């Protein structure tokens, strides 16, 4: 089950797991047409998938979706929490209480609700993988990122707490830092504008491998879900070979 299944990392993770014989459940906030396209692409390659439009801000939306999947489709073996929480680059004076709270609800509270819904079920079964995506802001704040950085930092700390409680119960919690620009039209493309995004792809993406490729990221997610419990990864960071790591980078271009 993927929460945050867009055309980038989330959709490619769903596709990767379906390729291995899993039934993928894709959840996203909007764009039924885009969701249908992702499901169709999985089915055309011989996989199976279902999709739901859910707004994680709404009360009970996550909880009801998890129950529906468990009851109508089957037990959730791997949960991928890939929900974005970017509310825009805003100065402190531009960051209203409402905007600050929105970042928290998207990045941290929705993860808490997902964990509260899924992990007790995994605990009863004595197994499961719970994979969580974050960005550079989970490690380092930057001007204009008051809401996003504090919320993503909270997401990382919540992952640590979940790991401390559930790893010994057979549940693999992984915090995955994607430290770089992802070649995804519905995230980076929207942030930059389509024209600028295509220019960037021609200069840094494609054969240059300077953008993080979602299908290659998906390979890592699948590998993490299959790790032997004697050598589990808790935290991992992914970036292009040509990018400086976040601790050596002068700015955060996310």
Model-predicted segments: where are they?
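Residue(s) in the substrate-gating loop at a strand-loop-helix junction
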Residues: 135
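Conserved glycine-rich Rossmann-like NAD(P)H-binding loop of the short-chain dehydrogenase/reductase
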Residues: 22-37
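C-terminal helical subdomain
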Residues: 168-171, 175-179, 183, 193-254
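Amphipathic alpha-helical dimer-interface segment in Rossmann-like NAD(P)H-dependent oxidoreductases
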Residues: 106-124, 164
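Catalytic Tyr-X3-Lys loop
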Residues: 93-112, 127, 131, 155
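Conserved mid-core segment of classical short-chain dehydrogenase/reductases
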Residues: 63, 84-101, 144-147
């Amino acid at each position: 089950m993927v929460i945050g299944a867009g055309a980038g990392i989330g959709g490619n993770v769903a596709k990767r797991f379906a390729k291995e014989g899993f039934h993928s459940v894709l959840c996203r906030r909007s764009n039924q047409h885009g969701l249908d396209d992702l499901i169709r692409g999985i089915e055309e390659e011989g996989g199976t998938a279902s999709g739901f439009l859910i707004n994680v801000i709404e009360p009970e939306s996550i909880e009801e979706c998890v129950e529906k999947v468990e009851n109508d489709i089957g037990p959730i073996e791997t949960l991928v929490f890939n929900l974005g929480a970017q509310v825009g680059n805003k100065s402190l004076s531009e960051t209203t209480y409402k905007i600050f709270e929105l970042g928290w609800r998207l990045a941290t509270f929705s993860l808490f609700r997902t964990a509260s819904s899924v992990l007790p079920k995994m605990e009863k079964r004595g197994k499961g993988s719970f994979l969580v995506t974050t960005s550079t802001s989970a490690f380092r704040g930057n001007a204009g990122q008051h809401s996003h950085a504090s919320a993503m930092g909270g997401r990382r700390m919540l992952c640590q707490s979940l790991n401390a409680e559930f790893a010994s119960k057979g549940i693999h919690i992984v915090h995955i830092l994607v430290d770089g620009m992802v070649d995804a039209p519905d995230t980076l493309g929207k942030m930059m504008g389509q024209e600028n995004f295509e220019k960037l792809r021609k200069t840094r993406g494609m054969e240059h491998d300077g953008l993080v490729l979602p299908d290659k990221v998906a390979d890592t997610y699948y590998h993490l879900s299959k790790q032997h419990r004697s050598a589990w990864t808790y935290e991992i960071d992914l970036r292009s070979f040509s990018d400086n790591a976040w601790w050596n980078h002068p700015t955060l271009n996310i």
